[in-house]
Amino acid sequence: MKSRREFLQLAAITSAIIGSRSFSSVAAKQSLSQNELLQFDSKGQVTLLHITDLHGQLKPVYFRPPSENYGVGDFEGIPPHLVGNEFLKHFNIKPNSSLAYAHTMVDYVNLAREYGKLGGLDRTSNIIKQIRAERGDNKVLLLDGGDTWQGSYTSLKTQGADMVSAMNLLRPDAMVGHWEFTFGKDRLAELLDEMQYPFLGGNVFDTEWDEPVFEAIKFFERGGVNIAVIGQHFPYTPISNPKYMVEGWSFGIRPEVIQKNINKAKKKGAEVVVLLSHNGFDVDQKLALTLEDLDVILTGHTHDAIPEAININNTLLLSSGSHGKYIGRIDLDIKKGKV
């Protein structure tokens, strides 16, 4: 059986093995079937699944990992700011393997010819269904980290409707956003009405009354555990995108608001607190160092794909890549209210 770390790596690249192409010579040598990829020892009472930054990609794609990823100050030379052979060495990944292809640009062109495209929402759906079947729906939370509706021809032509329809079939439990706001407030409202799950974001306020625009916290019971999910939309939306698209709304990181919502969640009996964030990895590393009683941060925006969660000040930080290539998973074992 696979360990949790191995599963996080293998689930990330399942699409390379079960994609539209038949097994190539390299893939065949890996001797990995979908069933083998999903063999692992589940732990604890709760499974968190994380997908983020799909950017409208319904079908498998070629998406080359970066050759540069600069970290500043204390973040230089540590995940996610590792690329190529340094990344492979740090995570003990074999060169020319499916994991090497999924996570680095090393010999990318040749490996792309061998392994083919990655991703595809149908393949993502298959993996999620199998995990839910193995664990039981009552133990699994599926969370969408945003940048889901925008980035493809079909999402442009349908103004996001294609992605909302597709994601409804996956049945996420909550979502946050960034490029979703670029459809404008009116279209955003229409799409939110079509969604069958909450659009959480505690860091957006209206500029007239300074009141929250969106629901900040959603409570779930999974595996007999009370879980609070706090949403965090991209804090720089009015700067990175045209401000008129979100006129009348104020964004920001607002760490004091996050801490307030964490405290509120704990007072209401949350045994696990999860921040579903589109801040970007380094911003969320900083938050993990300063916020109290936060158990997990599922981060997005920066498209970093890391094959295991990073523990920062007793907060697990997981980044699940982009464009449908990866699914992040964390199993949580909660005892006496502690993870």
Model-derived features with residue positions:
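Acidic, metal/ion-coordinating pockets
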Residues: 2-19, 23-339
